[in-house]
């Protein structure tokens, strides 16, 4: 087994970095992305570590850059992305970066403050302009004598009788348009109908100086009499956030004020345009460099975070770090350290020292853009234990194949393949666009999985001879109706029977198996489902048992690699015998029945289901029960007995052997380590030798207790009993679980057929001149439903079922998945623009 089928061999290494070279060395390691730093200060608060001030400075620069980026995006200026990977700035360059970012931030804040003040002034002048314009119209309408009847309620009866001249007060302002109805009701109720409100909409929306949004507003003027009503009206206007403006009473004064307002608006507009041009120039200059600035700052921040994980020796001249790294990359790591030392100008080289440890290393599986998606499928179940068999290489084939068994349709497979090919061909452009849509990003990351699923679906679709629920007659059917008339069919037979069955036993009726896949004649046969159900059910059982046997076989390589002979003798061997004795025999029976019975003898073929049930019951009736082959009873009884013997073999032998080994070690008076004889009471020096020897030869079989460990026979028996029961029952339930291959395939085929019959078939049946137009609409509905239901919904369903078959039925035979992932210190996410990670 090469490295492709296992995780990379990892080692724990210790780094000794000179203080002046540590920054550059960590920078080079980040560019390499092959080491995972361990935190050597787990008990130290993050705010008490050595480089916390540098981290804060980087965070402050990052905050300023986020502010600039927000302003750039608000101005709809594209951020330039040349794909450049800038080098990490030296620590001394941080001051220049801080000064530059401070200057840009202050300049933008000053521009924004001035612009907001000018826009607020511009808004007030614009509102005043509309007030002067609209109020003039209101006063012109007030001169109309018909208005007197509407406003007469404002006059007291005594005043009307005296004939004194009427003098009404008024206020004018602007309010948001959606508040007008509520505003009007409030005025009416509070003032008890003693005010007169006129309002008119402002045609163009006005820009809010704070948010930048455009708001629809209306001009209003309120007439009232008396100071008490005036105070009430002003309080209501204040509550509704209406802007009140002074409005002259005479037309001449209003005209003069309007002229002055228009002049000020023109001047203000000119100043705003100049300020906006200046702001655009500043933001465009920043947009050219902001991506590079982000990468530089966040690389520096990542380096200082990593340096905070290191220890500092007592001389304050050296930083000590511990890292996990792949053994195969040690040379490149050494080269990166030398390069970092040279860049820093240090004369003292950095040292990398491999360490011996009994800690479990992280799991690191190398992937590329093709295998990445399949490895994620495996890791979603659980990160593999260090150096155990990696299921991902086998999943590359088995996953899309089992998906295709459930999804098998040549037409749907073509559509899925074309979609995947489109994503593969345009992957560079799509990656450069950095699409933030989570759903599309998930689909795009699995583009090679979708590609293989589509290709395998085309293959299984040809096997099923199913293309949009119709068969492809490529080689011509092997069945012929003509010979039936030679024997016993007549015209009366055709007229008297709506359905007739062909007899393949008659010469010439059946010409042999179809060259590839299923004969197209079955598509129009009334007993199509009977035939296909039998075929797909048996196929599901065969594929499932082969898949599970393959999983059990892979466990052997794990036991051999980890040197666990007990697991081979009392685990793998009885497991493989148990499964092959029962379910492997079932597969043999299926193939035997297919080959032993032909068209002439098929009516005498016994039921495999009945035979398999009777095999467990040891029931073999003498009458009305035909055997498949001679000696069947003896062989089946032998296989069942062997399978039953495998149960105590798995259950008892391993705990008993472990107990015997423990007792033998316990009763030994002395142990010999490398020629040094140690008695029952070892000295301190000898004890250290023992401890070091036990550490270096750490037990590769976790089930075998060492001398110092207490062996709990009861716990071991319970654990082994659970494993045995789980495996034996799992063989039955997992085999039944693979029948989902048959069920999903049947459901997909039937949905496809219903869609064809209920939609496209109706469109094709229209024979009038409008048939083409009708077919266009029916085909549109057919295409939409095909993509939505059969490709997306059914595809997702088949995907989830294939996922379950791999996680539960396949991987639980050999894959423990109890490891933890190798997370190297890398600048890759920063380079790709995934700053949050």
UniProtKB/Swiss-Prot annotation:
Predominant subcellular localization, coarse grouping: membrane
Gene Ontology molecular-function annotations: ATPase binding; proton-transporting ATPase activity, rotational mechanism
Keyword hit for Membrane: yes
GO BP terms in the entry: vacuolar acidification
Keywords of this entry: Cytoplasmic vesicle, Hydrogen ion transport, Ion transport, Membrane, Phosphoprotein, Synapse, Transmembrane, Transmembrane helix, Transport
Positions carrying Phosphothreonine: 250, 360
Residues annotated with Phosphotyrosine modification: 364
Vacuolar face of the membrane: 408-409, 472-534, 594-638, 750-770
UniProt cross-references to InterPro entries, sorted A to Z: V-ATPase_116kDa_su (IPR002490), V-type_ATPase_116kDa_su_euka (IPR026028)
Membrane topology value: Multi-pass membrane protein
Residue spans crossing the bilayer: 389-407, 410-426, 442-471, 535-554, 573-593, 639-658, 725-749, 771-809
A cellular component annotation (GO) from this entry: synaptic vesicle membrane
Cellular compartment(s): Cytoplasmic vesicle, Clathrin-coated vesicle membrane; Cytoplasmic vesicle, Secretory vesicle, Synaptic vesicle membrane; Melanosome
Pfam families from the UniProt entry: V_ATPase_I
Residues in compartment: Cytoplasmic: 1-388, 427-441, 555-572, 659-724, 810-837
Keyword ATP-binding listed: no
Family indicated by similarity: Belongs to the V-ATPase 116 kDa subunit family.
Its biological purpose: Subunit of the V0 complex of vacuolar(H+)-ATPase (V-ATPase), a multisubunit enzyme composed of a peripheral complex (V1) that hydrolyzes ATP and a membrane integral complex (V0) that translocates protons. V-ATPase is responsible for the acidification of various organelles, such as lysosomes, endosomes, the trans-Golgi network, and secretory granules, including synaptic vesicles. In certain cell types, can be exported to the plasma membrane, where it is involved in the acidification of the extracellular environment. Required for assembly and activity of the vacuolar ATPase.
PANTHER family on file: V-TYPE PROTON ATPASE 116 KDA SUBUNIT A 1 (PTHR11629:SF68), VACUOLAR PROTON ATPASES (PTHR11629)
Subunit-level organization: V-ATPase is a heteromultimeric enzyme made up of two complexes: the ATP-hydrolytic V1 complex and the proton translocation V0 complex. The V1 complex consists of three catalytic AB heterodimers that form a heterohexamer, three peripheral stalks each consisting of EG heterodimers, one central rotor including subunits D and F, and the regulatory subunits C and H. The proton translocation complex V0 consists of the proton transport subunit a, a ring of proteolipid subunits c9c'', rotary subunit d, subunits e and f, and the accessory subunits ATP6AP1/Ac45 and ATP6AP2/PRR. Interacts with SPAAR.
Identification of the protein by name: V-type proton ATPase 116 kDa subunit a 1
Organism: Pongo abelii (Sumatran orangutan)
Species lineage: Eukaryota, Metazoa, Chordata, Craniata, Vertebrata
Underlying gene: ATP6V0A1
């Amino acid at each position: 087994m090469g490295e492709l089928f296992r995780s990379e061999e990892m080692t724990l290494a210790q780094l000794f970095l000179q203080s002046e070279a540590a920054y550059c060395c960590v920078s080079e390691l980040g560019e390499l992305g092959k080491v995972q730093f361990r935190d050597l200060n787990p008990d130290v608060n993050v705010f008490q570590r050595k480089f916390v001030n540098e981290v804060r400075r980087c965070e402050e620069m990052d905050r300023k850059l986020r502010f600039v980026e927000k302003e750039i995006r608000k101005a709809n200026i594209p951020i330039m992305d040349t794909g450049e990977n800038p080098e990490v700035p030296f620590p001394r360059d941080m001051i220049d970066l801080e000064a530059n970012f401070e200057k840009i931030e202050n300049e933008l804040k000053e521009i924004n403050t001035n612009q907001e003040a000018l826009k607020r002034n511009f808004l007030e002048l614009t509102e005043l302009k509309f007030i002067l314009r609209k109020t003039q119209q209101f006063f012109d309408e007030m001169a109309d004598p018909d208005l007197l009847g509407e406003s007469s309620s404002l006059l007291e009866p005594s005043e009307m009788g005296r004939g004194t001249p009427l003098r009404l007060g008024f206020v004018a302002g602007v309010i948001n348009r959606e508040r007008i109805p509520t505003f009007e009701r409030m005025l009416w109720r509070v003032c008890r109908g003693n005010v007169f409100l006129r309002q008119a909409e402002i045609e163009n929306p006005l820009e809010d100086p704070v948010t930048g949004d455009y708001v629809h507003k209306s001009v209003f003027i309120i007439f009232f009499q008396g100071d008490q009503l005036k105070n009430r009206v002003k309080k209501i206007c204040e509550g509704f956030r209406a802007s009140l403006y002074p409005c002259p009473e005479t037309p001449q004064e209003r005209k003069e004020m309007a002229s002055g307002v228009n002049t000020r608006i023109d001047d203000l507009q000119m100043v705003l345009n100049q300020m906006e041009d200046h702001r655009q120039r500043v933001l465009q200059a920043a947009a050219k460099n902001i991506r590079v600035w982000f990468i530089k700052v966040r690389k520096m921040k990542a380096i200082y975070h990593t340096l905070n994980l290191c220890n500092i020796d007592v001389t304050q001249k050296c930083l000590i770090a511990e890292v996990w790294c792949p053994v195969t990359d040690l040379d490149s790591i050494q080269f990166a350290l030398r390069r970092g030392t040279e860049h820093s100008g240090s004369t003292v080289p950095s040292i990398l020292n491999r360490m011996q440890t009994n800690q479990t290393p992280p799991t690191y599986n190398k992937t590329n853009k093709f295998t990445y998606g399949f490895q994620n499928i495996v890791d979603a179940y659980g990160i593999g234990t260090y150096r155990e068999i990696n299921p991902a290489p086998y999943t590359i084939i088995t996953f899309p194949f089992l998906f295709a068994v459930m999804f098998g349709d040549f037409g749907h497979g073509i559509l899925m393949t074309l979609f995947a090919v489109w994503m593969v061909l345009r992957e560079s452009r799509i990656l450069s666009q950095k699409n933030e849509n989570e759903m599309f990003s998930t689909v795009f990351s699995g583009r090679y999985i979708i590609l293989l699923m589509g290709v395998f679906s085309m293959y299984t679709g040809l096997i099923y001879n199913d293309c949009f629920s119709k068969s492809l007659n490529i080689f011509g059917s092997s069945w012929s109706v003509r010979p039936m008339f030679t024997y016993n069919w007549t015209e009366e037979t055709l007229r008297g029977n709506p359905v007739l069955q062909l007899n393949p036993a008659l010469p010439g009726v059946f010409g042999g198996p179809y060259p590839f896949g299923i004969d197209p004649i079955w598509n129009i046969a009334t007993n199509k489902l009977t035939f296909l159900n039998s075929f797909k059910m048996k196929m599901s059982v065969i594929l499932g048992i082969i898949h599970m046997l393959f999983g059990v076989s892979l466990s052997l390589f794990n036991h051999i690699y980890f040197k666990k002979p007990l697991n081979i003798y009392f685990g793998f061997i009885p497991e493989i015998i148990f499964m092959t004795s029962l379910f492997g025999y079932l597969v043999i029976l299926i193939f035997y029945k297919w080959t032993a019975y032909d068209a002439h003898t098929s009516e005498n073929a016994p039921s495999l289901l009945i035979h398999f049930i009777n095999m467990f019951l040891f029931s073999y009736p003498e009458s009305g029960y035909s055997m498949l082959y001679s000696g069947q009873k003896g062989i089946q009884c032998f296989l069942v007995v062997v399978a039953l013997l495998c149960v105590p073999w798995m259950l008892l032998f391993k705990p008993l052997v472990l107990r015997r080994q423990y007792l033998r070690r316990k009763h030994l008076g002395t142990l010999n380590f490398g020629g040094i004889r140690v008695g029952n009471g070892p000295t301190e020096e000898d004890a250290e030798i023992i401890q070091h020897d036990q550490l270096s030869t750490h037990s590769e079989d976790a089930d075998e207790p060492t001398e110092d460990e207490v062996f709990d026979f009861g716990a071991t028996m319970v654990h082994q009993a659970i494993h045995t029961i789980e495996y034996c029952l799992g063989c039955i339930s997992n085999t039944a679980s693979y029948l989902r291959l048959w069920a999903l395939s049947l459901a997909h085929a039937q949905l496809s057929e219903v869609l064809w019959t209920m939609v496209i078939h109706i469109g094709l049946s229209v024979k009038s001149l409008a048939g083409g137009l009708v077919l266009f609409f029916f085909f549109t509905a057919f295409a939409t439903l095909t993509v939505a239901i059969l490709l997306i919904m059914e595809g997702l369903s088949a995907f989830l079922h294939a996922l379950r078959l791999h996680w539960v039925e396949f991987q639980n035979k050999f894959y423990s998945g109890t490891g933890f992932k190798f997370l190297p210190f890398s600048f890759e996410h920063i380079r790709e623009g995934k700053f949050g990670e």
